[in-house]
Amino acid sequence: VGDDWQSIYRFSGSDMALFNQFPEYFGTTEINKIETTYRFGEPLVSLSSNFIQRNKAQIQKNIHSFSSEMRTELEFYAYDRRDYCNTIGQLVASIPSDKSIFLLGRYSFDDYYLSFMYQSIKEGNRFYYVIGGRKIEFLTVHKSKGLEANYVILLQCNKDTYGFPSQVSDDPVLNYVLTKSDQFPYGEERRLFYVAITRAKIKTLVLYDKRFPSVFVDEFLHPEKVSEESYVKHPNANKRWTRSADQFLLKLHNEG
């Protein structure tokens, strides 16, 4: 049992081909698709499904909600960098106090600006911000997989080296230990974005800098602006080989 739409751990050795090409590895196979979601409804069901299935390498599915009356919205908010924290505060204030909220970031440092304006609380491995008197958990999208909240606020969906999608390229030496990368532009990042926007039961709110919207944001709001050039990475977006990466390579080698 698995979901190739949510395969987001290539960096730790996950190989989507083992799932998508299962019959080639294990022979005669019967495939049964689970196409009912119990977390969210329309229009998010259709919007998220169309988004992830732009990559034809993903297994094609016809997802539907268990209830035709269930509604889950997907909204986008452009912010001015000077008013970024206030924008988040206003969004939080607009959400009923009895509803749960996640703040999600592509990177663990996507909450950087929040730390200047709002009180933070660390409880074990969990991290919160106090916004408008409410304690709201901040997580990376990777950590949020499998979790859910009534509302999700997705931070910093900008076109940047460390934006969403991330433009950072793996060092070529990692190809010796990691599985073959997705040939579809930003394939893994697309799956990660799908995971992010589908954590919500009521509404996902996507924040982006009005000057530098992510190509993923443009796919939803301005598809006419999207071209092949939109997916070209900046030539300087290369991950440097570091001592920690060297240790990671050695760990994978020792584990076989």
Model-derived features: where do they sit?
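Conserved RecA-like helicase ATPase core segment
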Residues: V1-R71, S166, V217
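Short glycine-/polar-rich loops that comprise or flank the Walker A/P-loop
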Residues: D3-W5, F26-I31, M70-E73, R134-I136, ...
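Conserved nucleotide-binding/hydrolysis micro-motifs of P-loop NTPases
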Residues: D4-I8, S14-M16, T37-E42, S108-D110, ...
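Inter-lobe coupling/hinge region of RecA-like P-loop helicase motors
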Residues: T28-T36, A57-R106, I136
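Conserved helicase C-terminal RecA-like lobe
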Residues: P96-S100, K135, K143-K210, E219
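Conserved helicase motor "Helicase C" RecA-like lobe of SF1/SF2 P-loop NTPases
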Residues: F109-Y128
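C-terminal/domain-terminus segments
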Residues: L207-Y231
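Short, amphipathic alpha-helical "recognition" segments used to contact nucleic acids or chromatin
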Residues: T242-G256
